[in-house]
Amino acid sequence: MFKFALTLTLCLAGSLSLAQHNPHWWGNRNTIVHLFEWKWSDIAQECESFLGPRGFAGVQVSPVNENIISAGRPWWERYQPISYKLTTRSGNEEEFGDMVRRCNDVGVRIYVDVLLNHMSGDFDGVAVGTAGTEAEPRKKSFPGVPYTAQDFHPTCEITDWNDRFQVQQCELVGLKDLDQSSDWVRSKLIEFLDHLIELGVAGFRVDAAKHMASEDLEYIYSSLSNLNIDHGFPHNSRPFIFQEVIDHGHETVSRDEYKELGAVTEFRFSEEIGNAFRGNNALKWLQSWGTGWGFLPSGQALTFVDNHDNQRDAGAVLNYKSPKQYKMATAFHLAYPYGISRVMSSFAFDDHDTPPPQDAQERIISPEFDEDGACVNGWICEHRWRQIYAMVGFKNAVRDTEITGWWDNGDNQISFCRGNKGFLAINNNQYDLSQDLNTCLPTGTYCDVISGSLIDGSCTGKSVTVNENGYGYIHIGSDDFDGVLALHVDAKV
């Protein structure tokens, strides 16, 4: 009897972890966008007016729980919880629930960035949160939950990142470290996540997962409710989990400890794609991209060119400030069939702490758009760049096809097909790419969705005529505005 019960428990745990890798996308949609620091009302409108019509699959939203108020309102104050009340500068619980419903109604899922590792860092005296809740972080007193000192690990600093105890039980940059093995802490975290599930979210990005023991997270995840069928989720659907685990290789706490619980952020993807498109590694080597580079298996990897943290760091990672290379890297990211793709939507920043666009009263302001739909008032909105949203459409059009017809010039010019549905060419050399290449597409004329669109039967940008053998003449000049060209069957004239 014991053996049968143990086997049943292991089978259930395995099926739950497998289910937590499913992002619950509509139809052929398969790209998430991180609308970093957007207000809930603005996200709802964006789902209805842009993301849904353009085929985006989901939105990662900023933390929803009450946070500390820090001088100047830096973005990172959102990562210092005071309570689990759903009131932030992005809006209140009613506005959040309205956003989730409206986005689900147009096929755009919502994934919440959640903070299970810690509460706020030290604050002199009494801290007041965005919902008006008082706390004394220095005393580990958070009555809005409530948490007291006994709910936290003993105070210590991470000085050795190769020491598992320090990484998982000491304070990450001074943030008060919760004890996830505590029944009370577990119950409050599960209650918080279940409330979000009740409101209709599809899953969670788990911040600082590396700093929590995988067995504690497994208990929390397995205790969560199924997704809310009133929001279009099938019966018995499990929340999609993707976990922030920074692992550059040879880490004491490894990404592999978390990959069976849900997807894991593949930070090496971000670093290596930046290296390649900055010219530090020839694009020809990208033919074996993915597991061939030592990355996680595709279904366990959350992939991105940059995220809200590493876009602010020096190094290989690309961001919006290098637009030509960034758009090429993003095009490759969305064209190559590896990983669960997320694109970034940023606001402009001059330093690490720059707050989101705000008014004189420190209220987040709504994005404004020019006649082309681009953001103009401090929001970057990379997801509204034609070269990026067009590749979201490309990714949808070629879903479930494989790489064929790889070509390269032995250096930084590459092309490949996605079955007989799509074709991508990139020129990252300082000389032109001008060549007849195999597009693998049926005979006809196709619009390049990078330089323009198919409108009323005509291309507003470049076009390529494909002959009966699948070949077309491809030209990407070294000084062209964009170093990439993309064709797919849904952009055939």
Swiss-Prot record:
Q: What is the effect of changing residue 324 to R?
A: In strain: Isolate SIM2
Disulphide linkage map: 47-103, 156-170, 375-381, 417-440, 447-459
Signal peptide boundaries: 1-19
Q: Where is this site: Transition state stabilizer?
A: 309
**Residues annotated to bind Ca(2+):** 117, 168, 177, 211
* Coiled coil ranges: none
Spell out the molecular function terms from Gene Ontology: 4-alpha-glucanotransferase activity; alpha-amylase activity; metal ion binding
What outcome follows a substitution of residue 50 to L? In strain: Isolate SIM2
- Cite the binding residues for chloride: 205, 307, 342
Active site, UniProt feature: 207, 244
State the CDD domains in the record. Answer: AmyAc_bac_euk_AmyA
Please list the GO biological process terms of this entry.
Answer: carbohydrate metabolic process
Q: Does the keyword Cell membrane apply?
A: no
Record's subcellular location:
Secreted
Cofactor detail note: Binds 1 Ca(2+) ion per subunit.
What are the annotated GO cellular component locations? Answer: extracellular region
Catalytic activity annotation: Endohydrolysis of (1->4)-alpha-D-glucosidic linkages in polysaccharides containing three or more (1->4)-alpha-linked D-glucose units
Q: Which cofactor does it need?
A: Ca(2+); chloride
* Entry EC no(s): 3.2.1.1
Which residues are annotated as modified residue Pyrrolidone carboxylic acid in the UniProt record? Answer: 20
Keywords, A to Z, come to: Calcium, Carbohydrate metabolism, Chloride, Disulfide bond, Glycosidase, Hydrolase, Metal-binding, Pyrrolidone carboxylic acid, Secreted, Signal
Q: Metal-binding: is it a keyword of this entry?
A: yes
The family database entries (InterPro entries) matched by this protein are listed as: A-amylase/branching_C (IPR006048), A-amylase_C (IPR031319), Alpha_amylase (IPR006046), Glyco_hydro_13_cat_dom (IPR006047), Glyco_hydro_b (IPR013780), Glycoside_hydrolase_SF (IPR017853)
Quote the subunit structure annotation: Monomer.
Record-stated family: Belongs to the glycosyl hydrolase 13 family.
Q: Output this protein's name.
A: Alpha-amylase-related protein
Organism of origin? Drosophila simulans
